[in-house]
């Protein structure tokens, strides 16, 4: 939590204004931020200076794990996070690759679970990683990536948190996650939860101890219409103690995550928080 608040203060104190072409808004921006989440110690990085909807963040992660490409599937899991980009993005609505209402196209897990090969066909990157790690193999390239520039035109949004690199060392599983762009008041709140939960899940289904997540953010920003709420409201609040996340121990495999796991299999305890803040969302 302190890391997150420190980053917010850094943006306010050191950030430079940049005009974002896609949203036509100014962003107060810094380059490079490194956050660490200690899964081994149970330090769940959930924001307490405002209410965070952690269930929706985990629902979105489950959708990425399953390779979903439709906002309706995400809603069924428990999040409406893709409704706007699938159905209100003017460029995507006019895109010939859009299949209809709620279609997201080739984004996130839809790329990672069927990564297009140059010689045709596709690779299931996540299954390869799970198979390797389950057999104690780390080939130094256990990377679940959603980043495919050749397919950007076939999806409603380029991936922001685009790469998850798993490493196995002496029986402990680590994760390096890379994010090209972070809407710090809104998106990063969820991304921190997702990185932590992803490592915890992968360690559990591959039968390893969980170590740390190292989360690199390249472009961290606060939109101009979010700035006052961050500066004058959220950063004036004192954080509460860190809550804890518990995952159903019956989850044993990738197939479990694909077939039957729901939000009921995740519990957060001792979560105390300040009132929610309605930050503007930029499509």
Curated annotation (Swiss-Prot):
Subcellular location: Cytoplasm
Disulfide bonds: none
Keywords: Cytoplasm, Methyltransferase, Nucleotide biosynthesis, Transferase
Classification via Pfam families: Thymidylat_synt
Family: Belongs to the thymidylate synthase family. Bacterial-type ThyA subfamily.
Descriptive protein name: Thymidylate synthase
This enzyme's EC code(s): 2.1.1.45
Keyword Metal-binding recorded: no
Main location: cytoplasm
Active site: 160 (nucleophile)
SUPFAM superfamilies: Thymidylate synthase/dCMP hydroxymethylase
A GO CC term assigned to this protein in UniProt: cytosol
Gene Ontology terms: biological process: dTMP biosynthetic process; dTTP biosynthetic process; methylation
Residues binding dUMP, per UniProt: 22, 180-183, 191, 221-223
Gene3D superfamilies on file: Thymidylate synthase/dCMP hydroxymethylase domain (3.30.572.10)
Source species of the chain: Haemophilus ducreyi (strain 35000HP / ATCC 700724)
Function: Catalyzes the reductive methylation of 2'-deoxyuridine-5'-monophosphate (dUMP) to 2'-deoxythymidine-5'-monophosphate (dTMP) while utilizing 5,10-methylenetetrahydrofolate (mTHF) as the methyl donor and reductant in the reaction, yielding dihydrofolate (DHF) as a by-product. This enzymatic reaction provides an intracellular de novo source of dTMP, an essential precursor for DNA biosynthesis.
Domain of life: Bacteria
List of residues binding (6R)-5,10-methylene-5,6,7,8-tetrahydrofolate: 183, 282
Entry keyword annotation includes Ubl conjugation: no
Quaternary context: Homodimer.
InterPro entries, per database record: Thymidate_synth/dCMP_Mease (IPR045097), Thymidate_synth/dCMP_Mease_dom (IPR023451), Thymidate_synth/dCMP_Mease_sf (IPR036926), Thymidylate_synthase (IPR000398), Thymidylate_synthase_AS (IPR020940)
Catalytically driven reaction(s): dUMP + (6R)-5,10-methylene-5,6,7,8-tetrahydrofolate = 7,8-dihydrofolate + dTMP
